[in-house]
């Protein structure tokens, strides 16, 4: 009998380190950044990750004889050094597709980032990327509508969509909240938004907010002749309550609802996405709590993984950071996971942080949402970075206008249309940004005041989580 059936404790690398293995098209592939305890060989650390995230346990057990672990086990098939980091290395692991329930992002993450992150042989562990096989993608529900359908629903084409978060995000009564929504929408925005932590608090119960927002949208649509929307946050303490709120939004004729997908959970998110498709509603996704998981460069889950998982779980819009605003995120990394949200096929490109080719098949794309510390001076860079299939959201950059929210919205709309017109004429937005905006401001006093107000506001901090690439 083979030694693999001998009783006792074995080194993980004897079973789970398989450098000769050639991954199958149907394998789910994962790249982990590993930092092992001192004195533990890389192969043992990597094999331990493969074991603990698939079929392994610390001891040989008799029940292994009842199945074929060689078929079901995860296999570490490659190890690479991390550029500029002598302590860490990349471990590439292949998992057979049968380890995962069809269409369940919850199950995939439970396996890949479950107990293994508490393993004593590791000082740090980070899930950098996942290659989802097309066979798995076809079992996932994906975005309830996607980019093309959303544009048709809102009747908006040829430019990024424009939005803002209502401020102050907490403390307003339902009526005053609706008033701010109206001011922003009549000023020229396409969307306004609940912030992530506005649910149903004593100062503003959710039914009250929904009703006043619906009235504000109807008035703004009548005044402007444009389709408008507001992201009504239906995140709740139970799934039943979440669906009750979504149903009420539908009854009011609202086009879109919102969910905090990390705090709410992937199971709730997938269920809500299915409901939205069935009921003809758009779904905006906020990423609240993501930085707890993704910001440490050596431990956690990279946001590109969360973005991929969200596309599979379902959402029509997802916050991605801004590059130029107040939130973490360098340009190349951000472009890398924006590609994962919108494209049908994304090739391996380490300069953008993509470790694998990713084929999305026919799955609809997701709008990238730029939000957090942005204002009119950022508009040329935002249009360049994010392109048309994006939502640019200015919270303080709308409400902070000296003339009020309507004027702030008008300034942003004029700046956006000026940038799109200049781009379409072949001008270089970032090199000519000042000239483009100042020319537009000659015909818009709202924009002129906004440019003067925000001219000194910058968020120039180094990125904590940088790409691991050789210079």
Swiss-Prot record:
Binding-site positions, substrate: 115, 165, 169, 287, 319, 371
Keywords: Bacterial microcompartment, Calvin cycle, Carbon dioxide fixation, Carboxysome, Lyase, Magnesium, Metal-binding, Monooxygenase, Oxidoreductase, Photorespiration, Photosynthesis
Catalysed conversion reaction: 2 (2R)-3-phosphoglycerate + 2 H(+) = D-ribulose 1,5-bisphosphate + CO2 + H2O; D-ribulose 1,5-bisphosphate + O2 = 2-phosphoglycolate + (2R)-3-phosphoglycerate + 2 H(+)
UniProt cofactor note: Binds 1 Mg(2+) ion per subunit.
Broad class of the protein's primary localization: other
Alphabetical list of Gene3D superfamilies matching this protein: Ribulose bisphosphate carboxylase, large subunit, C-terminal domain (3.20.20.110), RuBisCO large subunit, N-terminal domain (3.30.70.150)
GO molecular function: magnesium ion binding; monooxygenase activity; ribulose-bisphosphate carboxylase activity
EC main group: lyase
Lineage top rank: taxon: Bacteria
Site positions per UniProt: Transition state stabilizer: 326
SUPFAM superfamilies named among the record's database cross-references: RuBisCo, C-terminal domain (SSF51649), RuBisCO, large subunit, small (N-terminal) domain (SSF54966)
Pfam families: RuBisCO_large (PF00016), RuBisCO_large_N (PF02788)
Cofactors, names only: Mg(2+)
GO cellular component, one term: carboxysome
EC number, as in UniProt: 4.1.1.39
Modified residues (N6-carboxylysine): 193
Compartment annotation: Carboxysome
Any Gene Ontology biological process: reductive pentose-phosphate cycle
PANTHER family (UniProt xref): RIBULOSE BISPHOSPHATE CARBOXYLASE, RIBULOSE BISPHOSPHATE CARBOXYLASE LARGE CHAIN
Quaternary assembly: Heterohexadecamer of 8 large chains and 8 small chains.
HAMAP family: RuBisCO_L_type1 (MF_01338)
Purpose: RuBisCO catalyzes two reactions: the carboxylation of D-ribulose 1,5-bisphosphate, the primary event in carbon dioxide fixation, as well as the oxidative fragmentation of the pentose substrate in the photorespiration process. Both reactions occur simultaneously and in competition at the same active site.
Protein name in the entry: Ribulose bisphosphate carboxylase large chain
Record organism: Synechococcus sp. (strain RCC307)
